[in-house]
Curated annotation (Swiss-Prot):
GO molecular function: phosphoribosylanthranilate isomerase activity
Pfam families: PRAI
CDD domains: PRAI (cd00405)
Superkingdom per UniProt: Bacteria
Protein species of origin: Listeria welshimeri serovar 6b (strain ATCC 35897 / DSM 20650 / CCUG 15529 / CIP 8149 / NCTC 11857 / SLCC 5334 / V8)
PANTHER family associated with the record: N-(5'-PHOSPHORIBOSYL)ANTHRANILATE ISOMERASE
EC number: 5.3.1.24
Assigned protein family: Belongs to the TrpF family.
Protein's recorded name: N-(5'-phosphoribosyl)anthranilate isomerase
Coiled-coil intervals, chain numbering: none
Keywords: Amino-acid biosynthesis, Aromatic amino acid biosynthesis, Isomerase, Tryptophan biosynthesis
């Protein structure tokens, strides 16, 4: 099971993710309380082994913003959380995760247009895209129409519910941010417990 820890801002949190077996580490460049600059992400990325993929999270970025981050950090994957056209995803010089908010149990009509991207299902956004700490309605989703080897589940995951999510969706990976925080800050102990719990599912 691929595990992505998202919204990291401190070296100690990156270290906790690395030491406990995270497969992807996410840096948020979109406006949010977890936002980092390219320079900050570059410094944090120095402590990430090459076998762990570095992901940049964006909302409706320009081509220039994407290119600057991909080269400056550098990034292996870009995660697009806005209304980005498929053409932008196809032109990007990195792998792509396209995030879709699941509203009222419905998958977006254009989800199949992103043929080469990983598909991330998340709860509907509130103040900003992602990191809301809320789950979408798992019972209403027919994940059979999605490619399991491209599917990533996010939205309100934590150590208590991640095993159920994995059994239900059989995804390629799971993505967490607020579920490994205490009082709005990343918690190394929660990072450790979540990764071990997610990877312990048979």
């Amino acid at each position: 099971m691929i595990v992505k820890i998202c919204g990291l801002k401190k070296a100690v949190d990156v270290q906790a993710a690395v030491e406990n077996g995270a497969d992807m580490i996410g840096f948020v460049f979109a406006k949010s309380k977890r936002q980092v600059t390219i320079e900050q992400a570059h410094e944090l990325a120095k402590n990430i082994p090459t076998n762990i993929k570095k992901v940049g999270v964006f909302v409706n970025p320009t081509e220039e913003e994407l290119t600057a981050a991909i080269k400056g950090v550098p990034l292996d994957i870009v995660q697009l959380h806005g209304q980005e056209p498929t053409s932008q995803a196809e032109r990007t010089d990195a792998e792509v995760i396209k995030a879709f908010p699941v509203k009222e149990g419905k998958l977006p009509d254009n989800i199949s247009d992103y043929k080469n991207a990983y598909i991330l299902l998340d709860a509907p956004a509130e103040e900003y895209e992602g990191g809301s700490g809320k789950t979408f309605d798992w019972d209403k989703i027919n994940s059979d129409v999605l490619l399991k080897n491209k599917l990533i589940i996010a939205g309100g995951l934590n150590a208590e519910n991640v095993q159920e999510a994995i059994h239900r969706f059989e995804p390629y990976g799971v993505d967490i941010s607020s579920g490994v925080e205490t009082n709005g800050e990343k918690d190394p102990e929660k990072i450790e417990i979540f990764i071990k719990t997610a990877k312990g599912v048979e």
